[in-house]
Structures are given as structure tokens and as C-alpha cells.
Amino acid sequence: MSSPVPGLMLPEKRVVEVRNLSVYFEQQGQRTDAVRNLTFSVDRGETLAIVGESGSGKSVTSLALMRLVEHAGGVIHQGDMLFRRRDGQVLDLRGARQRVMRTLRGADLAMIFQEPMTSLNPVFPVGEQIAESIRLHQRMDRRAARAETLRMLDLVRIPEARNVLDRYPHQLSGGMRQRVMIAMALSCKPSLLIADEPTTALDVTIQAQILQLIRVLQREMDMAVIFITHDMGVVAEVAERVLVMHRGESVEAASVGQIFAAPQHPYTQGLLAAVPALGSMRGQPFPAKFPLLDQNTARIVDNVPQDTVPAHAEPILQVSNLVTRFPIRSGLLNRVTRQVHAVEKVSFDLWPGETLSLVGESGCGKSTTGRALLQLVESQKGDITFDGQRIHQLKGAALQHLRRDIQLIFQDPYASLDPRLTVGFSIMEPLLVHNVCRRQEAEKRVAWLLSRVGLEPEHARRYPHEFSGGQRQRVCIARALALNPKVVIADEAVSALDVSIQAQIINLMLELQREFGIAFLFISHDMAVVERISHRVAVMYMGQIVEIGPRQDVFERPQHPYTRKLMSAVPVADPSRRQREQVLLVDEIPSPIRAIGDEPTTAPLVQVGKRHFVAHHPIAGAY
């Protein structure tokens, strides 16, 4: 073990103090400064939020504190990182040996990573993984460590914790896996918890649970917390102080109240302007672009909302009683014994120039609905009509022709672009496959499409890895628009992007809708973004639509309890409206898996207003 280093002093309540930290990465002789001259501190019981967009250096800062940045090729070449252990001794993390760091990590210093599935070992039960940390740092035997593991799972409000002990990570939902990560991080009562984007990929209701859980446990353990995020709504919900990072440097640091009430730096002002605030569209019947601030000049760029749905138009897409189920085989004869009831009797219409948003939590069936429209998954029942033609049983050339008119934008642009092809060829490929034009004309159209989505024509020669996340999503939008589609299905198209990039992509989609009359089926779990972009909204739960209507009615007068639950879980980017603590919701969405012949109960939608329909029946877990 290490001993206190003479001369290192911290104020009594101070847990960590970072002074002039600089980190760089070197690759092929080129040096990239990831963090430059960063200074901050965190006291016991305090939460510091470090915010900024991708590439700002916030995650590198956390890895430097854990001394894990060296394993990723980083070099800490300047600065001090003073840290107070639980026993009161102070040491400089920068100068600590790896042997000492191994005793600190998981004990005095703990970290929750963004993606729990990649942080948990898939071949060990989650209980064994938590118990291993407890045995290592607290010198407990197996029986005592298992009992302490059970106590920690109870502490993080996992229902039926005893049954969860022996489950593997893949058998748990995203919210449950993140709670397991929190239990593991807190199992040895650390002085400092670093939470690196712990809720970014989670649904709003699960996110609300995780944020409240961290606050409750912080109070119980009097722990310092560094919360790393790009979501300003989350910052307003959890932080006492905020550090804003941009290109590896601190551009502003102040109390959470000061940052939100009177941000000084143009970059901070731009971040806040790009935050989709729930309720900001109150009284407005049509979608509206984000009033973006130029982050260099702080000048606002706004527009006037206008209707893009032609009067007296017929629906371009009609879906009636769509049912999609996936078989589960088991037993010696590999027979179908159960089914995943992904979509149950879903019906809706979509008009030209309209955006209909499908919202709900993971597993509600919204993505399956979008894929079923293009026959990317097989539906068992239902009727789909596109532009007056029934399409749900099209095959061969007829189906290929349909896919010219209905295009799909996926959530992960990197996974949906071939890394071996230039982005120019990826955009051109649909034009060549469908024999729309010759190669020379296709190259001209690619240049025009890239310009239209805010990229340069010369970018056509680059590969996907040479672009940022937001730029890659623009490439995917350009590819989707190459064939002049009438309908675009956007499946979580902006959920993984930084707030300002997200706002730019939403604005681009609204511009293209206004220019070309495209109808969007926008699939999302982000209620604040949905409020901004939608004409109408359909709320899905357990494969069923439980509420559908004009966006203004659904958001300002939600009728179904599940819709209200989704709304109340959205973090508000205003610390003065910080949600008072509610009873922690631990209900998981019931399983959609049923035995053969066990039909789910569905209820017809009842009209409660003009084009506003609600399912009037109690659904377990929705209330």
C-alpha cells in the first residue's frame, strides 16, 4: 500500500483536486492534445458535471483520473491529481504506481461506464462479478461476499434481487444492467464515483430511475460524484457545479444555477440553445426548427414554423391491424413453443409532408413496426397500403421498386455504412442498383446531395471513419434521399448524437420535408425531440398503440397514464424546476414473450378529441 506523500494538502472536505492536467495521444508520429491545462475540484457530497460534445476531452479526463488513459495510448504529461482516500490520506494519482492504482480502483475510486453490456463479463453471472470486487477489496469470504452482493442489489432497487444474482448480463434489460454496474461501483463505498454518460442510451423512465438512485446513494454514503454527460437536462437534474469543456479545454465553470441562468461563453450558450426542452412548443401547431446559436458569435438563427401537409391530401401510407411475432424454438425437436409478441394490431395513417412519431421504451415494438413496412421482418397479419397499392405481400421486382419510395435511416450511422466504400459510392449505390441514371449523372447527384445535407462535394472521396458521428448521419440522410423517396423511416436517427449535432440534423430533416414534401415516420424514445419535429404522435406500449393524436393534444393534454409517465420522466434543462424526489419506480416492462395460444389482451382506441384516440384499459406497469 502507498503511504501519504509529504507536502500534499487538501481542504478538509475536498476529495479530489486536479491542477493544470494535460493529456495527449501520439499516433504515427502525430501528437493530439486531448486535454489542456484543466483545473477543477470536487468536495465530499458534491456533484460536479463535466459537459461537452464528443471529442471535448471529458471522458479522457475521467480515464486520466482512473489512470486508465495509459492503456488507451494516452500520456499524462503535465499536472497534479490530488485525491483523498477513505482513510484520509492524500496522494497524487499521477505519480501513483499501477500496483497502488489497482488497490484504489473499485475501492476508493469507482467508475460507471456508458455501456454496461460491454463493461460486464458475458460469461459470469452478475452476482459473481460484484462479489469478486468485494472479496478483492474487503477481504471477505465467499459466503459473506455473496450476502453483501445481495444487499447491494437491494440497495440499487433491483426487484427480486436474489433471483438476479445468478443471471447473466444478456438476461437483464438495459436499466437492470446499469443498476448492476452501479451496485458494483458502490460495493466498496468509494470516496469518488465517476459516472461517464451512464444514462445516454437508456429510455427516459429508466434514466429518471438511475439519476434518482445515484442521488439517493450519494447522500447515504456522503460521496463525491463526477458526472460526465452531453445532456444539459441531466446536468440540471443532478449537479451542484458545472465544468464546460470544448476541444480539450475548460471554457466555463460555475454553479449550476449560474450556468443555466447566465452562461458567459458562446459555446455554453450554444449548448443550452440546442437543448430540446419539453414544453417549448406549447401553443404551436406545427413542427419548428431549433433556434440555433452560432457557438462562435452567440448570434441566434431562427425560423417561422409552417405547415407542410397539403390540404385535402390522401394518406400516402395506411397501416391496419399489423401483427408481427417472432417464434422461439426449444426442446428436443426444436419446435416453436413461445412467441415474442412484438407488434399487436397496430393501425395508423401517414400523410404526405407529415411527421408521425412512434414513441415508447425499448422493446415496445416501434422499430419492428418500421421494419415491417419494408418487409425487413415478416408480419403475420394486417394490411399495409402505400400510395393506393397494397404492399404487405409484395415480392421480387415489385418489392425492390417499393424500396425506392420508402427509405430507412438507422440509429447507428457507422454500422449502416460499409467501411470499405467511400461515402460517395455508398450514396451512389442505390442510384446504380435501381438503374435511375448513369454513373456520370450519379456522381453529379452525389455532389448535390452532399451539399444539400451540409457537407462538401469533395467529401465523397472519404471513408466513413474519417467523419464525426453527426457528419456520418448526414451521409446516411443523403443516401436515403438519393432516390427521391416519398416516405423516410428514421429509426432513432438522432438519439446517439450530441445535442447541437442533434439539433442540426432535426433542422435539416425539417428543411428537406419543406422542400421535397417527404413524409417521415420518426421512431424515438426522446420525448423532447419528438415534440419539436412531429405533426402527430403515436405512443406504443407492449406492441400496442395506447394513444395517438396531434402532437399538441398528446403533449399538452395526454390522456393515457403511460403517456403521462413518459412525459414526467423527461429531465428538464432548468435547475430551478429540478424534480422533487418521487418513489423510485422499479417495475420492468413485462415480457412480450408468451406461450403458443396465449393471446394478449388488446383494446380498441376510443376517440377523445379531433383525431385524438386513446386505449381505455388498464395495462400492467403503465399506471
Swiss-Prot record:
Chief place where the protein resides: membrane
Which GO terms of the molecular function aspect are on file? ATP binding; ATP hydrolysis activity
Tell me if Ribosomal protein is a UniProt keyword of this record.
Answer: no
Q: Which InterPro entries did the record assign? A: AAA+_ATPase, ABC_transp_ATP-bind, ABC_transporter-like_ATP-bd, ABC_transporter-like_CS, Oligopep_ABC_C, P-loop_NTPase
Keyword entries, A-Z: ATP-binding, Cell inner membrane, Cell membrane, Hydrolase, Membrane, Nucleotide-binding, Repeat, Translocase, Transport
Q: Is Repeat among this UniProt entry's keywords?
A: yes
Q: What is its EC number?
A: 7.4.2.10
One of the protein's GO biological processes: peptide transport
* Entry membrane topology: Peripheral membrane protein
The protein's annotated catalytic reaction(s) are: glutathione(out) + ATP + H2O = glutathione(in) + ADP + phosphate + H(+)
The entry marks the following residues as binding ATP, namely 52-59, 360-367
Q: Which SMART domains match?
A: AAA
Instruction: Mark the transmembrane ranges.
Output: none
Where does the ABC transporter domain lie? Answer: 18-272, 317-567
Report the CDD domains cross-referenced here. Answer: ABC_NikE_OppD_transporters (cd03257)
Query: Subunit structure of this entry?
Result: The complex is composed of two ATP-binding proteins (GsiA), two transmembrane proteins (GsiC and GsiD) and a solute-binding protein (GsiB).
Q: Which family does it belong to?
A: Belongs to the ABC transporter superfamily. Glutathione importer (TC 3.A.1.5.11) family.
UniProt-recorded name of the protein = Glutathione import ATP-binding protein GsiA
Q: Taxonomic lineage of this organism?
A: Bacteria, Pseudomonadati, Pseudomonadota, Gammaproteobacteria, Enterobacterales
